[in-house]
């Protein structure tokens, strides 16, 4: 996979270019440069660790939107087996901005679904850049109700800039579709685990984000509006997105401190896209242990705990 570096990663990119140049020289001239390459690799690793240990909120937002960041299909391929995709909301369309279907986790049946932004231009357009319309949310709800009927736990992957704000989506009652999902997910009698893998934009994320365990990856974000949108409203200047991101508290560690999510999963050095297999392995271990624990909770108690979790958010003494 071709690496892409963000602006704040430029020192890392420069070192990587030097390492690649030395490898080419050594390969062409049969010169042993292994010691120098090893020294630069160690320096690059140290530099990467130093940069990523002190990222600003706006830089984390850029990481959450990284063009190579793993998407729902990447996690499905690595975490689950026997995935069988299910299409459509049975009313309007195939609803491709959310992908979902039945799969197995360690041999046990689960229902898995999540936003899919797409990777190449054609797929991005087909997936509507991961921005769900009413049909996507109704499709998601159909799959979750199917999971409830067949006693399968639900795993959702959240990565969207927000619900699609187009005229057609409004005509098909976008707000009702989101509200209905919030209402239904709070009552569905099966374990639900929600994982924020990239950006979680407002109601577009919440519509598949009500669960018994809410998990965020280290460099993911959760917000009611994008930093650019916030800056445009407050200061009439989208270039102040960095300042807005800092004030909004959108990062995983801030969200966790405010007790809005249950846990934050560390990412491989440099972000999840640097080692997708390792990131998926960490999530698989976590999902396995969390689902085992949730299955032991009586369903009536599970629903009550889920309800109380969300009712307690934002409460003040």
UniProtKB/Swiss-Prot annotation:
Catalytic activity: N(6)-carboxybiotinyl-L-lysyl-[protein] + acetyl-CoA = N(6)-biotinyl-L-lysyl-[protein] + malonyl-CoA
Pathways involved: Lipid metabolism; malonyl-CoA biosynthesis; malonyl-CoA from acetyl-CoA: step 1/1
Assigned GO CC terms: acetyl-CoA carboxylase complex
CoA carboxyltransferase C-terminal domain mapped to chain residues: 32-293
UniProt entry keywords in alphabetical sequence: ATP-binding, Cytoplasm, Fatty acid biosynthesis, Fatty acid metabolism, Lipid biosynthesis, Lipid metabolism, Nucleotide-binding, Transferase
Pfam families reported for this sequence: ACCA (PF03255)
GO molecular function terms noted in the UniProt entry: acetyl-CoA carboxylase activity; ATP binding; carboxyl- or carbamoyltransferase activity
Subunit: Acetyl-CoA carboxylase is a heterohexamer composed of biotin carboxyl carrier protein (AccB), biotin carboxylase (AccC) and two subunits each of ACCase subunit alpha (AccA) and ACCase subunit beta (AccD).
Family affiliation: Belongs to the AccA family.
Protein name, as recorded: Acetyl-coenzyme A carboxylase carboxyl transferase subunit alpha
Organism field: Legionella pneumophila (strain Corby)
């Amino acid at each position: 996979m071709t690496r892409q570096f963000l602006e704040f990663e430029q020192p890392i990119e420069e070192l990587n270019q030097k390492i690649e140049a030395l490898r080419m020289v050594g390969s062409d001239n049969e010169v042993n440069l292994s010691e120098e390459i090893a020294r630069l690799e160690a320096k690059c690793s140290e530099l990467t660790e130093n940069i990523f240990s002190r990222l600003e909120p706006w830089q984390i937002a850029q990481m959450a939107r990284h063009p190579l960041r793993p998407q729902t299909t990447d996690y499905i391929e690595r975490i689950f087996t026997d995935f069988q995709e299910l299409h459509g909301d049975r009313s309007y369309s195939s609803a491709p901005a959310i992908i979902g279907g039945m799969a197995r986790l360690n041999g046990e049946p689960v229902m898995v679904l999540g936003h899919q932004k797409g990777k190449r231009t054609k797929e991005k357009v087909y997936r509507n850049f991961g921005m769900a319309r009413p049909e996507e949310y109704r499709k998601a709800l159909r799959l979750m109700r199917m999971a409830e009927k067949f006693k399968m736990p639900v795993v959702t992957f959240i990565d969207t800039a927000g619900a699609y704000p187009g005229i057609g989506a409004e005509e098909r009652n976008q707000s009702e579709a989101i509200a209905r999902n919030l209402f239904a997910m709070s009552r569905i009698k099966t374990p639900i685990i929600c994982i924020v893998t990239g950006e979680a934009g407002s109601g577009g994320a919440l519509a598949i984000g009500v669960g018994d365990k809410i998990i965020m990856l280290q460099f993911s974000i959760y917000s009611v509006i994008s930093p650019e949108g916030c800056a445009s409203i407050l200061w009439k200047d989208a270039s102040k997105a960095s300042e807005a991101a800092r004030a909004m508290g959108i990062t995983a560690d801030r969200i966790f401190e405010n007790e809005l999510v249950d846990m934050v999963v560390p990412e491989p050095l440099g972000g999840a896209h640097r080692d997708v297999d390792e990131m998926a392995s960490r999530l698989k271990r976590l999902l396995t242990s969390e689902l085992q624990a949730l299955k032991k909770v009586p369903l009536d108690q599970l629903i009550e705990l889920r309800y109380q979790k969300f009712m307690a958010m934002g409460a003040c003494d």
